[in-house]
From Swiss-Prot:
Species for this entry: Yersinia pseudotuberculosis serotype IB (strain PB1/+)
Topology with respect to the bilayer: Single-pass type II membrane protein
Segments crossing the lipid bilayer: 112-132
Places the protein is found: Cell inner membrane
GO MF, one annotated term: DNA binding
UniProt feature, compositional bias: Polar residues: 223-242
Residues in compartment: Cytoplasmic: 1-111
UniProt keyword list: Cell inner membrane, Cell membrane, Cell shape, DNA-binding, Membrane, Signal-anchor, Transmembrane, Transmembrane helix
Domain remarks: The helix-turn-helix (HTH) motif in the cytoplasmic domain of the N-terminus is involved in the formation of spirals to maintain the rigid rod shape. As this protein is anchored in the cytoplasmic membrane, the HTH motif may contribute to protein-protein interactions to form the RodZ helix, which is localized beneath the cytoplasmic membrane. The C-terminal domain may be critical for determination of the rod shape by probably interacting with enzymes required for synthesis of the peptidoglycan layer, including PBPs in the periplasm.
Function: Cytoskeletal protein that is involved in cell-shape control through regulation of the length of the long axis.
Protein name: Cytoskeleton protein RodZ
Every HTH cro/C1-type domain range: 19-79
C-alpha cells in the first residue's frame, strides 16, 4: 500500500508543483522570482500551475522552467523528463519556399513596364522634334516670302532701291527739258551740260577760287546774241554767275540771262541722294549689322523707308516720322538704337523667330 501511495504522489508532483514547493521552502514570493528572472508575475504563475501559454513557443517555456529550477536549487534532470511527458515538443511550422519562377515572372513584368515607359519617352521626344521642325520650316518660309515680296517691289521700281527722302530733300532737276531763251529759241541742256552742273556744284570751292574778275571773263562763257539759233552750253555760265554775285553785276548786257531762262541755282542731289542727309534728327534709327539680315522699315505715314537684305558689317541710318514698324528676319544679326537709346531685341532672339515691333511709340 505504501508503494502505490508513493507512486501516486510522485505522479501528481508536476514540475510546477515542485517549483512552487521549492520556492516556498526558500521563503521567496512569486514577485521576487519574477524580478530575478526578469519575467512577468503572470508567467511565473502559469509555470507553477502547469499552464502552457498558447502564443509562447515550447522552447521558451522549457527555458523559463530551467531558469526557475536553477534559482530554487532543483536538478534539471528530474524536471525535464516529466515536462516532456506532460508537454511534448511541438514541431515548428516552416513556410514553404517560393519558386524561382515567381521571381522570373516579376522580372518579365518589370521588363514590359520599362519597355512601355521607353516607348512613351521616345514618342514624346519625336513629337517635340516634329513640332520644332514645323516651326523652323514655317519661319524659313515666312522669311523667303518676305524676300520675294522685297524683290518684287524692287523689280517694280526698275531695279532701284526704295528712295529714302524726307520733306526737306532737294529734287533732282530734269536733264532733258529744254530751257527757253529770248525770241522763243530753246536752248537744250544736254547730258554734257548736266554733268557740268554737277561737277561745278560738287567742286564749288575750286570754282570760286578759279573764277576771274569781271574784267577778264572769257568770251567763251558768254551767251550768244539773241538772233543766233544755234544751241549753246549755258550750264557753266549760269553756275558761275550765281556763285559770283559781284561778277554778275559787271557783265555786259549780252551776258545777262534772258527772260524765261532759269536764274536760280540748279537743285543738286547730295552725295547720298537716297538717304536723308541728317542722321541725328529727331526720330532717327541707327542699325548696325553683324550678319546678313532681311529688314523692312515703315514709318507712321506708311512710307517704306527700307525693304531688302543688308550685309554683315553695314550701318543703316533712317529718318522719318515716328513711330516705325520694323520687320526683322534675323533679330540676332543686328543692333538697333533709336535717338541714341538701344532697342531691346532679346525676347525675339531667345524665341528664334521673325521680329515684328514698333519703335518710337510715345
Amino acid at each position: 500500500m505504501n508503494t502505490e501511495a508513493s507512486q501516486d504522489q510522485t505522479v501528481t508532483e508536476t514540475p510546477g508543483v515542485r517549483l512552487r514547493q521549492a520556492r516556498e521552502s526558500l521563503g521567496l514570493t512569486q514577485q521576487t522570482v519574477a524580478e530575478r528572472l526578469c519575467l512577468k508575475v503572470s508567467t511565473i504563475r502559469d509555470i507553477e500551475e502547469d499552464n502552457a501559454q498558447a502564443n509562447l513557443a515550447s522552447t521558451f517555456h522549457r527555458g523559463y522552467i530551467r531558469s526557475y529550477a536553477k534559482l530554487v536549487h532543483l536538478p534539471e534532470d528530474e524536471l525535464l523528463p516529466i515536462l516532456e511527458k506532460q508537454a511534448p515538443v511541438r514541431a515548428a511550422k516552416v513556410a514553404p519556399m517560393q519558386s524561382f519562377s515567381l521571381g522570373k515572372k516579376h522580372k518579365k513584368r518589370d521588363g514590359w513596364l520599362m519597355s512601355f515607359t521607353w516607348l512613351i519617352v521616345l514618342v514624346v521626344l519625336g513629337l517635340t522634334g516634329a513640332w520644332w521642325w514645323q516651326n523652323h520650316q514655317a519661319q524659313q518660309a515666312e522669311i523667303a516670302n518676305m524676300v520675294d515680296q522685297s524683290s518684287a517691289q524692287l523689280s517694280q521700281n526698275g531695279g532701284q532701291p526704295v528712295p529714302l527722302t524726307d520733306d526737306n530733300s532737294d529734287a533732282i532737276a530734269p536733264t532733258d527739258a529744254p530751257a527757253p531763251v529770248a525770241n522763243g529759241q530753246p536752248v537744250p541742256l544736254t547730258n554734257h551740260s548736266t554733268s557740268a552742273v554737277t561737277n561745278s556744284a560738287t567742286t564749288s570751292s575750286a570754282t570760286t577760287s578759279s573764277v576771274p574778275t569781271t574784267s577778264s571773263v572769257p568770251k567763251t562763257t558768254l551767251v550768244p546774241k539773241t538772233n543766233s539759233t544755234e544751241p549753246v552750253d549755258t550750264a557753266n555760265t549760269n553756275t558761275t554767275m550765281h556763285q559770283e554775285g559781284a561778277a554778275s553785276a559787271a557783265v555786259s548786257p549780252s551776258q545777262v540771262p534772258q527772260p524765261g531762262l532759269s536764274t536760280g541755282p540748279s537743285p543738286l542731289p547730295t552725295a547720298d541722294a537716297g538717304v536723308s542727309g541728317s542722321t541725328s534728327s529727331v526720330g532717327a534709327l541707327v542699325m548696325n549689322f553683324t550678319a546678313d539680315c532681311w529688314l523692312q522699315v515703315v514709318d507712321a505715314t506708311g512710307k517704306t523707308l527700307f525693304s531688302g537684305i543688308q550685309k554683315g558689317g553695314a550701318v543703316l541710318n533712317l529718318a522719318g516720322k515716328a513711330p516705325y514698324k520694323l520687320t526683322i528676319g534675323a533679330p540676332g544679326a543686328l543692333t538697333i538704337s533709336y535717338q541714341g537709346n538701344p532697342v531691346d531685341l532679346s525676347k525675339f532672339i531667345k524665341a528664334n523667330r521673325v521680329a515684328r515691333l514698333t519703335v518710337g511709340v510715345e
